[in-house]
Design a protein with these regions (language model features):
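Non-catalytic terminal/accessory segments
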Residues: 1-599
């Protein structure tokens, strides 16, 4: 039998080559065992693999028998997803809480299999302007597109849809899926996931709209829904764009001709009179650099979306932006059954920063002239600048994490973090390094990146003060204690290979190199369909703990979240540490009686 992944690669290629193709009989691929090994391989390494839904069902205990039960329930139509367990996490920079839905692991596994099938069809047809929750795309690819393509913009429209993920209309979504996929069983299964409901404080609640945040399928379903918005904006762009031949403005032409006349006069003059005319010549040249060379009759619209956040750049008037905003409002209300937020959908002049994906975006207005060969150019004029919002993002991070306090003169003073004192020295420096690298890596595209140098200083001395406070010592003694011969400081620790030292992260090395010219090709999804290691290990029918090899014995996967948390006291822990794997194929007896000890 041909591997399912090979079939899906062919489907993906067909989807790319024939954009209007409609796909049928996809449900049958959910009745093939090999897709569940791929789904499990994709899921078990995630932190949430051991997080329970409403049932005691996690990545631990996966087996061939479990796959057979899933396939049988899908085949005879008895499968119904369990309600998700509702929990809340804090929103960034807000006191509000974000609802999160935790499905059971069996539901996650089936959702992942459905996601793999849907992705093979939809990924090749999604527009280049969409960057959220897609392979080889990220916040950085969206920002690099803005940097590369938004140059010369005069206005920004910052888009915000009210409660986007909570307000996706189920009937509209299924209708959109049915345009591309003619498979009643697949549509019904997706509808079951949408209508599964949630359990909060052990009370069941129905779901009438939205996709559960935390669900495996939710990001892809949201992209399918918002793909309609992408298509609409690109159609709007075709109507709006007007790139006429640029004509030099009369004011610019008149001043330019006057400068030429003065230049000819200068050749005939001498002495004080020449100096006086030269001064006039320089003043007019300076004024010329501030005038727009051509009439602003061109109209260009550019658009980028990441999940439910989008931004539009407009080369046109403010009235054009208001017209675009009104068109968006009508489309989102009539077609998507959602609302565009009037308060948060802002029209911003490009000389002022517009906020998108945690960056401030603006277009430079520069009168600085640089010589390029024989010609002088305003090299930065009209280029897009990506900036770190230092006051909002970095200042807030420092306050939230209690890294420093602000003195009366507005300067910062690094302090120790009380809540980290019970951690080991190695854990403390690891936390600080992780936070510093995370921020520096995310803001590596910013033109004001070097302003994070002071933030790195605050982080380093807060780390040192935390370790000093832990040991009840002074800052200078702590530095002396952990400094090596090169003058750098780090925390020594020991592993099997010998003694090591973890240094505090070097600020200059935290920034990843980026190329703004990189473009992403729209290619079919390639899975690589050789049988995966996990499938081979399970089908070998050999216990990796006791060595039992019996065709009549059931074999299961034992799963742990982190190998580094294992103490190595038990035989099975030593086996996992030796293999450096989160999974261990064990027989039923070892799993129940040796590892879980009759649990």
């Amino acid at each position: 039998m041909k591997p399912t992944m090979a079939i899906l690669e062919r489907i993906s290629k067909n989807s790319q080559e024939n954009i209007d193709e409609v796909f049928t009989r996809l449900y049958r691929y959910l009745l093939r065992p090999d897709i569940y090994y791929v789904a499990y391989q994709n899921l078990y390494s995630n932190k949430g693999a051991s997080t329970k839904g409403i049932l005691d069902d996690t990545a631990d205990g996966f087996s061939e028998e479990k796959i057979k039960k899933i396939i049988q329930s899908l085949k005879d139509g008895t499968y119904y997803p369990q309600p998700v367990r509702r929990m809340y996490i804090a929103k960034k920079n807000s006191k509000k809480m974000r609802p999160l839905g935790i499905p059971t692991f069996t539901d996650k596994l089936i959702q992942e299999a459905v996601r793999i099938i849907l992705e093979s069809i939809y990924e090749p047809v999604f527009e280049d302007v969409s960057h959220g929750f897609r392979p080889q795309r990220s916040c950085h690819t969206a920002l690099k597109t803005i940097k590369r393509e938004f140059g010369g913009a005069r206005w920004f429209v910052e888009g915000d849809i009210k409660g986007c993920f909570d307000n996706i209309d189920h009937v509209t979504l299924i209708g959109l899926i049915n345009l591309k996929i003619k498979d009643m069983k697949m549509s019904q299964l997706i509808y079951k996931f949408l209508k599964a409901g949630y359990l909060e404080n052990w009370q069941y609640h129905k779901t009438y709209s939205g996709t559960p945040q935390g669900g495996i399928l939710s990001p892809l379903l949201a992209n399918i829904y918002l793909h309609e918005l992408d298509k609409f904006v690109l159609q709007l762009k075709m109507k709006f764009d007007r790139e006429s031949p640029e004509r030099i403005t009369p004011e610019y032409r008149e001043l330019h001709n006057e400068i030429k006349r003065i230049s000819h006069r200068l050749k005939k003059l001498e002495g004080e009179e020449k100096a006086k005319v030269l001064l006039e010549y320089q003043e007019k040249r300076k004024r010329l650099t501030t005038l727009p060379c051509t009439s602003q009759t061109n109209k260009v619209l550019k658009y980028v979306r990441y999940a439910d956040d989008f931004i539009i750049s407009v080369k046109g008037s403010k009235e054009d932006c208001q017209w675009i905003k009104e068109q968006l409002k009508l489309f989102i209300h009539n077609k998507l059954k959602m609302e565009l937020s009037e308060e948060k959908t802002l029209i911003t002049h490009s000389s002022q920063p517009a906020r998108f994906l945690g960056y401030d975006i603006r277009v430079r207005r520069s009168g600085t002239i640089k010589r390029s060969g024989k010609v002088k150019k305003r090299t930065l004029n009209g280029s897009v600048e990506l900036l770190i919002p230092l006051q909002d993002k970095i200042r807030q991070f420092i306050f939230d994490k209690k890294i420093a306090i602000q003195k009366k003169d507005s300067s910062w003073f690094p302090v120790h973090r009380k809540y980290l004192i019970r951690s080991t020295d190695l854990e403390i420096i690891t936390i600080y390094n992780s936070e510093l690298r995370g921020i520096c890596n995310y803001y590596g595209l910013a033109s004001n990146f070097n302003q994070l140098n002071y933030f790195a200083y605050l982080m380093e001395y807060s780390c040192l003060k935390t370790i000093a406070s832990k040991h009840k010592g002074t800052l200078s003694k702590t530095i002396s204690m952990f400094k090596d011969g090169s003058g750098s400081w780090g925390i020594p620790y020991e592993i099997k290979q010998g003694k090591q030292r973890r240094y505090f992260a070097n600020f200059s090395e935290c920034k990843s190199p980026y190329q703004f010219t990189d473009k992403i090709s729209q290619a079919p999804v390639l899975y690589g369909y050789a049988r995966n290691t996990l499938e081979n290990r399970l089908k070998a029918r050999c216990c990796e703990l006791c060595g039992t090899s019996d065709e009549n014995t059931s074999y299961e996967i034992h799963h742990v979240n982190k190998v580094k948390n294992l103490k190595g006291k038990e035989k099975w822990e030593m086996a996992m540490i030796a293999k450096q794997r989160k999974t261990l194929v064990v027989c039923f007896h070892c799993h129940r009686h040796v590892i879980h000890k009759h649990k």
